[in-house]
Regions:
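Core segments of small alpha/beta cavity-forming domains
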Residues: 69-115, 260-301
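Short solvent-exposed beta->alpha transition segments
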Residues: 92-151, 287-315
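Extracytoplasmic/luminal low-complexity segments enriched in Pro/Gly and acidic/polar residues
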Residues: 247-376
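Intrinsically disordered, low-complexity Pro/Gly-rich regions
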Residues: 1-44
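Short, low-complexity N-terminal intrinsically disordered segments enriched in polar/charged residues
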Residues: 30-85, 256-270
Length: 376
């Protein structure tokens, strides 16, 4: 028999060595142990989550508390007190910005810091109390205050405004604490309060003068003297929620500025009187219609002044009228009168004149204009 040759059928196949059963089971156990969570790691994760939740809760509670604390100072009465604090401090500009006075700009002349700085007394706050309608969007707040020791109350209307960031309360005071003061004048064209001035309306026979607005306080109204013949006589009033004045005339203004005339006017009256007396004591000056009738004659042959007034006395009923005693010595022919020389006693009266605005009328030389007459 021939020898058979065995030819290879293909590439040899590699065979992994067999793993013992004990080793295989051990590897499986290690893999399972690695993939399973350990008790310590899970506990740490739970603690971290708990801490985060706790912090968030603390922040939420703190935020709620902070909002409540903030809103506790954003109440209707707090808003009113803030407004009154500005007035008490004389901060008129900030008070006006906070609560609109509700008047035209040309009526706000005296609602300024400078005017309030001039006040002898300003607002003192005693108490501020809101009503109990806590859920209402419109609240009533009553403030008790003083000016110069005089107590008064004022009720404010406060309305709820749009909240800030949706959570912080806002309130708006609707009515400003301003008071109307009526002013009239006789003999003055202007007056000042503090560093502000205004035209002084002429005093009327009846009714009140022009109206101006003021914040509470004690103010001095100082008239501006139009000439050297007029003194400036100030008037001081207490402005609360109404004006506390000394006059009781219901038709009178709160402030009446009445001109007072000084010695310069008396001197001017004497000077003017002396000139007219000298004129009447001359011929033909004696025939001037203002001269005493007894010396207005062409039968007068001589005239002189026997007694010249040295002082012109103001009339009690009219401080702008003056009088003085004059004696002329006149000599007559027998044309109309009994011939001879005799004294003519008379009273010189000078009335100062006023223009249409009630101001002292002056001539082109700046001297007072007088109407001259003789009583007899």
């Amino acid at each position: 028999m021939g020898t058979e040759k065995n030819e290879p059928m293909g590439a040899p196949i590699a065979v992994s060595p067999a793993i013992p059963a004990e080793c295989d089971q051990s590897m499986r156990n290690e893999t399972a142990a690695a993939s399973a969570p350990t008790p310590g790691r899970g506990k740490k994760r739970a603690m971290a989550i708990g801490i985060v939740i706790g912090v968030l809760l603390v922040l939420v509670v703190a935020g709620v508390v902070a909002i409540k604390v903030a809103n506790s100072s954003r109440t209707p009465e707090a808003q009113v007190r803030q407004y009154l604090d500005l007035l008490a401090a004389g901060n008129a500009s900030a008070a006006t910005a906070m609560v609109d006075p509700g008047v035209a700009n040309d009526q706000r002349t005296f609602l300024t810091d400078g005017v309030m700085a001039s006040a002898q007394s300003r607002l003192v706050i005693e108490d501020v109390v809101a009503d109990r309608n806590d859920e209402s969007s419109t609240r009533s707040v009553t403030a008790t205050m003083q000016v110069n020791g005089e107590r008064f109350t004022h009720q404010f209307t406060v309305t709820k405004a749009k909240p800030t960031m949706g959570v912080l309360d806002n309130w708006q005071v609707k009515d400003a604490l301003v008071t109307q003061v009526s002013v009239d004048a006789q003999g003055y064209a202007q007056f000042t309060v503090g560093d502000e001035s205004a035209d002084a309306p002429k005093k009327q026979v009846t009714g009140e003068g022009a109206t101006f607005f003021f914040y509470p306080g004690v103010y001095t109204f100082t008239p501006v003297a139009p000439s050297e013949y007029v003194d400036s006589t100030p008037v001081t009033v207490a402005v609360l929620d109404v004006v506390h004045r000394t006059n009781t005339d219901g038709d009178a203004s709160d402030v009446s500025l009445l001109a007072t005339y000084n010695n310069n006017l008396k001197d001017a009256a004497l000077e003017a009187g002396t000139k007219i007396v000298d004129s009447c004591a001359s011929i033909p000056g004696n025939q001037n219609s203002v001269c005493p009738f007894a010396i207005q004659s062409d039968a007068l042959t001589a005239i002189s002044v026997k007694t010249m007034p040295t002082y012109m006395e103001p009339l009690k009923t009219d401080p702008g009228a003056f009088q003085g005693h004059v004696t002329f010595t006149a000599t007559y022919s027998n044309k109309y009168y009994m011939e001879g020389t005799r004294d003519v006693d008379t009273v010189l009266i000078l009335d100062v004149q006023f223009d249409s605005d009630g101001l002292l009328k002056l001539d082109q030389d700046g001297k007072p204009d007088f109407r001259v007459s003789f009583a007899r």
